[in-house]
Amino acid sequence: MNAQAHRAYAEFLPEPYRSDSVAEPVSEWWEWRGRRVHMLRAAVPEAPVRILAIHGAGGHSGLLWPAVALGLRENVDATAVDLPLYGRTIEPDPGGVRYGQWVDLLCELVHARAAADDRPLVLFGASMGGMLAYEVAARTGAVAHVVATCLLDPADPAAPAALTRWNLPGRSGPRLLRWIDPVGGRLRVPIRWITHMDKMSLDPELSRLCATDPLGGGARIPLGFLRSFVDYRHTPPEDFTAAPVTLVHPAADQWTPPELSIRFLERIPGRRETVLLDNCGHFPVEEPGIAQLAGAMRAILAEAGGSGR
């Protein structure tokens, strides 16, 4: 269960971050449109700020928890969610899950939590979760800061080739997915067949763990989900005014090149910042990048919480 799965991922962190991540989160459940959504939580009622961690394709809350734990020293109330198809969330119709449902779920979760808790909320999105965090902030207006390891815009012609194993030119990949969708959209295939799970980390052992984890990279996704992502039109960055955005992109990412995310970020007219995590792969665990990530998170959480630190 991913309530303990974070321990396996924490083993790949250098100290002191490995020890920091051993604090046990607890499981919470939320009913949403006939689904039981699972979350990991470290509740700190007296904390001045909240953080919600959002995984991407092939991830889950346990995989992200060691990254979330980087902020636990900073007196933060932390949650990581399992989106449908991943983790322990109970999905009644796996073949029908589409990217837009992920956006809707997260927006409603943010609104539901905000109605009961008015502390500032920071969204931390990893991989595909970066664009989810961005879109949720744009749609809800209830987010103090967006932190993303990746901002891969499917409208960018280079994005599908970076996302998938299919080295098809330009928009050929999306056209193929649209052609397949009416008859094969519900067909579920292992995510590692479609995406570069082998490039998840610079450490082959960590990449192998991610690719075979039945709660994450070892799960199956419907082809229609991938089609729904490449066809999804996010809020144009030129129109984004919801919150400051910090891109914390691994500098040595072999899966999604940093320049794709940077050129999206630079179209945002408001406050934005790029922090390149030196020596880090797509799943950042290496020094000195992990220390750079921890430092960026400390500064963002302190500012969002109004502590002035």
Where are these regions (language model features)?
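The serine-hydrolase catalytic nucleophile loop
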Residues: 57-69
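Short beta-strand/loop motif that positions the catalytic acidic residue
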Residues: 241, 247-249, 253
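Alpha/beta-hydrolase-fold enzymes
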Residues: 131-215
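Active-site glycine-rich loops that stabilize anionic/oxyanionic intermediates
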Residues: 56-60, 127, 251
